[in-house]
A protein has these predicted regions:
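Beta-sheet entry/capping signal
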Residues: 16-19, 47-49, 68-69, 91-92, ...
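Conserved catalytic-core segment of nucleotide-activated headgroup transferases in glycan assembly
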Residues: 1-56, 63
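C-terminal amphipathic helix plus adjacent low-complexity
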Residues: 8-11, 21-23, 29-36, 49, ...
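Acidic donor-binding loop of glycosyltransferase active sites
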Residues: 63-76
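Catalytic binding pocket for nucleotide-activated donors in carbohydrate/polymer assembly enzymes
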Residues: 73-158
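Short acidic active-site motifs
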Residues: 58-59, 81
């Protein structure tokens, strides 16, 4: 599962920590459950940080300034959280799957020109994250490049997005009616 993959990454990057933002973060039950889950993989509780709901959008987005890499969940990808990470310049590593729920990260990263951040397997997911964590020069470069890539992409250009969607729908209609 995802805890195992995140633990492998934490074990491979000494001194690293994982920030998990969740509505139930203040719950002692959630804390105990996560501590036990990560402990099974040799991760001390002080390496897994929990953050709860931030009442202000600015405070929520400011948390992205405290992380170097966003590790997408699997099989359910982040959508809004992935967009927020990219908006804040945080590179996202994702693991692609076969269904919509596990292809959102692929779509977002491909549309900003970063398909190399998409893993096809659990092993590749870990390798991408560890390699990136050990490359501070690339991390710094991505921190400034990613917001510009996002702003210039089709994701932030509704007119261009709509034209491409219209073209795709027209093509699908033509294929369907030509049978």
């Amino acid at each position: 599962g995802i805890v195992r993959r995140w633990s492998v990454i934490l074990n491979a990057v000494p001194g690293s920590r994982l920030l998990i933002k969740a509505g139930g973060a203040a719950s002692q039950c959630v804390r105990a459950h996560l501590d036990a889950a990560f402990a099974q993989h040799g991760i001390a509780a002080n390496r897994v940080l929990l953050a709860g709901h931030a009442p202000k959008t600015e405070d929520h987005l400011d948390l992205y300034n405290t992380v170097d890499i966003a590790l997408d969940t699997f099989p359910y990808h982040g959508a809004t959280t992935t967009c927020e990470a990219l908006w804040m310049g945080v590179p996202v590593v994702t693991r692609v799957g076969d269904s919509h729920r596990s292809r959102v990260g692929l779509s977002l990263l491909t549309n900003i020109g970063l398909p190399g951040m998409v893993a096809e397997s659990d092993e590749q997911y870990v390798q991408l994250a560890v390699r990136l964590a050990n490359d501070p020069v690339r991390l710094k470069r991505l921190r400034t490049e990613i917001p510009a890539r996002l702003r210039q992409s089709i994701l932030c250009d509704p007119a261009r997005f709509t034209r491409q969607l219209e073209d795709a729908l027209t093509q699908a209609w033509q294929v369907r009616t030509s049978r």
